[in-house]
Amino acid sequence: MAKKVQAYVKLQVAAGMANPSPPVGPALGQQGVNIMEFCKAFNAKTESMEKGLPIPVVITVYADRSFTFVTKTPPAAVLLKKAAGIKSGSGKPNKDKVGKISRAQLQEIAQTKAADMTGADIEAMTRSIEGTARSMGLVVED
């Protein structure tokens, strides 16, 4: 018989840097999960990723206080900022442009995000990422 699910906890945690301080500690402490056990498992799973990159994680907490977790790919906005070499997007994306990004870089990001996106094909996913780039004030070059 399958374990009874008590809760799903969604967090964004820096790769390789999970520790019991907020947001991890309070979110998991409320569910009665062993926080250090999660931190060690998460850090071990994300050690091959770039340290400090925010990684979305969905933690499934069971009634017996055990847990499983699934890591996702980093948010598109974070990958776009990294590719364009900027610190933050534009406050007025239609007026102030903050950087440029090539279509090849967009396709590379779409390939990275393909596992988490529900697009029909890579072209549709690339267009979705392109929309995110434009809303951040990035100019897309061919």
UniProtKB/Swiss-Prot annotation:
Q: Which PROSITE patterns does this entry report, sorted A to Z?
A: RIBOSOMAL_L11
Q: Does the keyword Ribonucleoprotein apply?
A: yes
Which InterPro entries does this one have?
Answer: Ribosomal_uL11, Ribosomal_uL11_bac-typ, Ribosomal_uL11_C, Ribosomal_uL11_C_sf, Ribosomal_uL11_CS, Ribosomal_uL11_N, Ribosomal_uL11_N_sf
Output the Gene Ontology cellular-component terms. Answer: cytosolic large ribosomal subunit
UniProt-recorded Gene Ontology molecular function terms: large ribosomal subunit rRNA binding; structural constituent of ribosome
Record function comment = Forms part of the ribosomal stalk which helps the ribosome interact with GTP-bound translation factors.
HAMAP family (UniProt xref):
Ribosomal_uL11
* Quaternary structure and interacting proteins, as annotated: Part of the ribosomal stalk of the 50S ribosomal subunit. Interacts with L10 and the large rRNA to form the base of the stalk. L10 forms an elongated spine to which L12 dimers bind in a sequential fashion forming a multimeric L10(L12)X complex.
> Could you tell me what this protein is called?
Large ribosomal subunit protein uL11
Q: Which gene encodes it?
A: rplK
